[in-house]
């Protein structure tokens, strides 16, 4: 059986966010770097650093937390894996779902790389729906 790196990074980020951790350390691959760049660009995480340890590269993510009047920290990051190795989900450009009326994002793997739902609609291309983030 293969390892699902996308599910691993989603789980790591979700667990760190629920436990109010400030940073997350994940393994660096081309797919994880593309997804992290999208998260950084969309404002779901604050900072990304690339770290090398024993000839292995890691990404260290700094999570963004919002202060609330009642709670000291509010969990604002919700991630859900959609397409998985056992069941791939594909969509064309007209049927890409909108998350919370456009507030959330859908990350797709297309023939032109990994991108958000807005970019895929503008380029009029579909692809594999990797995950929802809101």
Curated annotation (Swiss-Prot):
Q: Which InterPro entries match?
A: Ribosomal_uS8, Ribosomal_uS8_CS, Ribosomal_uS8_sf
Query: What are the recorded Gene Ontology BP terms?
Result: translation
Which GO CC annotations does the UniProt entry carry?
A: chloroplast; ribonucleoprotein complex; ribosome
* Compartments in which it is found: Plastid, Chloroplast
Q: Which GO molecular function annotation, any one, does this entry have?
A: structural constituent of ribosome
Q: Which domain of life is it from?
A: Eukaryota
Q: Keyword set for this entry?
A: Chloroplast, Plastid, Ribonucleoprotein, Ribosomal protein, RNA-binding, rRNA-binding
Protein family? Belongs to the universal ribosomal protein uS8 family.
Q: Which protein are we looking at?
A: Small ribosomal subunit protein uS8c
